[in-house]
Amino acid sequence: MNYYLGIDCGGTFIKAALFDKTGKMFSCVRENVQVISEQAGYAERDMDELWQIFARVIRQTIERSQVSPQHIKGIGISAQGKGAFLLDQENKPLGRGILSSDQRALTLVKQWQEQGIPEQLYPHTRQTLWTGHPVSILRWLKEHEPERYQRIGSILMSHDYLRFCLTGELHCEETNISESNLYNIHSGQYDPKLAELLGLEGIIAKLPPVIAANQIAGYVTPKAAELTGLAVGTAVVGGLFDVVSTALCAGLDDETKLNAVLGTWSVVSGVTQHIDQQQTLPFVYGCYAEAGKFIVHEASPTSAGNLEWFVKQWHLDYAHINQHVASLEPASSSVLFVPFLYGSNAGLGMQACFYGMQAHHTQAHLLQAIYEGVLFSLMHHLERMRKRFPQANLLRVTGGPTKSPIWLQMLADFTGMRLEIPQIEETGCLGAALMAMQGVNESADVFQAQSMLHVEPNPAYFAAYQAKYQRYQQLTTALKAML
C-alpha cells in the first residue's frame, strides 16, 4: 500500500499525519512551536528550531505508524500564509522568520494607506495591504535593518522554507505567493512594477521560481532523510496555503457554499472560476489548488485564540466553559466582548475589551460574551463574502470550535444559515497529502465517503442575536473613533 505524508505548520503547532489514498489517517503527531515576541508587535520563529521540530514530528509520525518509509510516495506541506522567511546568499537563515501576525510595520502600512497605495495595487494583485504581507515586512527591514535587507538571497514563506530544508530546492508556491502583493494575479507572474510602487526596487530577483501546489518541487535529500526518517528520493510537492487546504477539505467546488474557519484566525472563503471586475469591495483573491480557480477570502486574527488566552488566565477546561455558556439564555446579556487581543478587522491598532458589565454578571456571562464576540467578528467577514457569493446558502465550518456543540448552534442561530461540519480531523495535513497524491499521479478518492455533521438554525433566537450584533458594531465604531 502507498502512503502520503501531510504536514501542517500552523500558528501554534506543527502537525504531521500519514494517509492512504482514501484519506484514512494512520498516525498523527503534533508539537508546539514557539512564537517569539521580544518587542511589542513582534511575532517571530527561530528558523533552525522550526526545521528541527518539523523533522522530529515527521520521524515520530513514521515511527508511530510502523509504515516503511519506502512506502511513503509523496509529501506535501500546508502552512500559514504571508510573513517572510529569509535566506542569505549562502542559503542560510537570515535572522528569524517573521510571521503574518507580526505588526512591526503598522506605521508604514498606515502611511501607505494615506498615500492610496493599496488602491493602486488592488487592480493588479486583488489583495489588501496589511502588516503581515511580505512587502510590508521587507520595506520595514529596508528602512530599519538595511544591512540585513542587503544580505537577502531568497524570500520564502514558511512552507517554502521547510520544503527547501527537505529538498535543497528553492521555489515559491503559487497559492501562497499569489497573495504577496508582488504577484500579478492576471498575468500569473511576479510584477516588478508592484515592487517599485512599494519602494522595493530590485526585490523580484530575490524571489525563487513559482511552483504549483501539486507540482513536484524536489526530492528528499540524504541529509534530510537522516533527520526525518524519510527515504532518500521521496517526492515533495509545492504544498499550499492553509486557508486553501481547509477550503479543499471542506469540499468547496462552486459558489453555493462558503467555508468558515474558527481557529487562530477567523476566515471565510469561497471558490470561483472568475475575478468579478464589477465588485466594489476589495475582496481578496488568490490562486486555488485547482488550475483555473481562485479562492476568495476574508480573514483576521480575531477567533478562538481569544478564548485560549482566557482559558490560560482562569485555568478553565473546555467542558466547563461549554456548560457555563449553555446555561445562559442566548444573547440575553448586556456584556459585549471585542476579540482583538491579537489584531483587529475593524481598524488598525484596535484592541480587545469587555463592555456592558454590571455587578450581577458572572464568569459565565463573560465566557458567553467571548463566544459571541468571536462570532460577531466572523460575521464582519461573512457579510462581505455573501455579497460576493449571493447564491451561497450553506456554511461549512472547520476549526477547533467545531468540537463545541453550543458554539456551533450559536453560529447557526446568529447567521440563520444551515451548517455542515466535515468530519475531517486534520484539514491542513489532509489537504497537503492530497496535493502529494496528485503530484505523483495517485488516483485519490478522499472525499467520496466523507461524512458531515449538520446543524440547523433555531429562528427563535435570530432577532436577539441580530440586535446584539448591532450593539457590537456600534461599540467597535465608537472604539475606532478613539484611535
Swiss-Prot record:
InterPro entries: ATPase_NBD, Carb_kinase_FGGY, Carb_kinase_FGGY_CS, FGGY_C, FGGY_Carb_Kinase, FGGY_N
PROSITE patterns (alphabetical): FGGY_KINASES_2 (PS00445)
Gene Ontology MF terms in the entry: ATP binding; L-xylulokinase activity; phosphotransferase activity, alcohol group as acceptor
CDD domains: ASKHA_NBD_FGGY_EcLyxK-like
One Pfam assignment: FGGY_N
Keywords, in A-Z order: ATP-binding, Kinase, Nucleotide-binding, Transferase
SUPFAM superfamilies (alphabetical): Actin-like ATPase domain
Reaction equations catalysed: L-xylulose + ATP = L-xylulose 5-phosphate + ADP + H(+)
EC number: 2.7.1.53
Subunit description: Homodimer.
Protein family: Belongs to the FGGY kinase family.
Annotated protein name in UniProt: Probable L-xylulose kinase
Organism field: Pasteurella multocida (strain Pm70)
